[in-house]
């Protein structure tokens, strides 16, 4: 994004961290519209987006119907459901329980010394609820990473490897304060 929790707070010349102001989908769309204005784009041919991007698509349609005559929201809703709010709360709790969270003020720590374990756990939780049980069963079943293993205490299942992969991928590109 254009700015976020790692941006410098002009009040104290340090990263905002956990005191970064809350923003809404409407705020994001207003900012996008200003960028479009700056670029001289008065009307989009179509706007498409999935998940949180889909919420932005819906907001474009509500706020600027004349600028967004065709919208295609994918895998989204007008607002988060109670269940989605609950899943998000559990993910944020996983981040906050990481000892390297430091109340969201970890930007001045050594590189790589942020709440990566908590963020990876939050991502694993999210990945589980993004798919159905049938989808997990079809893709992974009970397959082990090491096919020659005898189901020992520390053997790893393919599904665990999948969750680890997505957690590692997220911590390389995402700020835990933005979760």
Predicted regions and their residues:
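A generic structural signal for ordered alpha-helices
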Residues: 10-14, 103, 157-160, 175
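Hydrophobic, aromatic-rich cap/lid helix
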Residues: 167-179
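Alpha/beta-hydrolase-fold enzymes
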Residues: 67, 73-169
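Gly/Pro-rich cap/lid or specificity-loop segments adjacent to the active site
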Residues: 1-55, 62, 66-78, 82-89
């Amino acid at each position: 994004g254009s700015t976020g929790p790692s941006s410098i707070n002009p009040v104290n010349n340090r990263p905002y961290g956990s005191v970064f102001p809350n923003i809404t989908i409407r705020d994001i769309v207003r900012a996008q519209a200003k960028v479009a204005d700056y670029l001289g784009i008065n009307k989009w041919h179509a706007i498409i987006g999935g998940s949180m991007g889909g919420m932005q698509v819906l907001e474009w349609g509500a706020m600027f119907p004349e600028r967004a005559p065709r919208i295609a929201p994918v895998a989204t809703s007008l607002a988060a459901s109670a269940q989605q709010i609950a899943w998000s709360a559990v993910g944020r709790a996983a981040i906050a329980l990481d000892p390297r969270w430091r109340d969201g003020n970890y930007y001045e720590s050594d590189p790589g010394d942020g709440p990566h374990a908590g963020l990876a756990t939050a991502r694993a939780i999210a990945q589980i609820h993004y798919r159905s049980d049938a989808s997990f069963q079809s893709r992974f079943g009970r397959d082990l990473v090491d096919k020659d293993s005898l189901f020992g205490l520390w053997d790893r299942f393919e599904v665990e490897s999948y969750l680890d992969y997505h957690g590692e991928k997220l911590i390389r590109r995402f700020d835990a304060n933005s979760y």
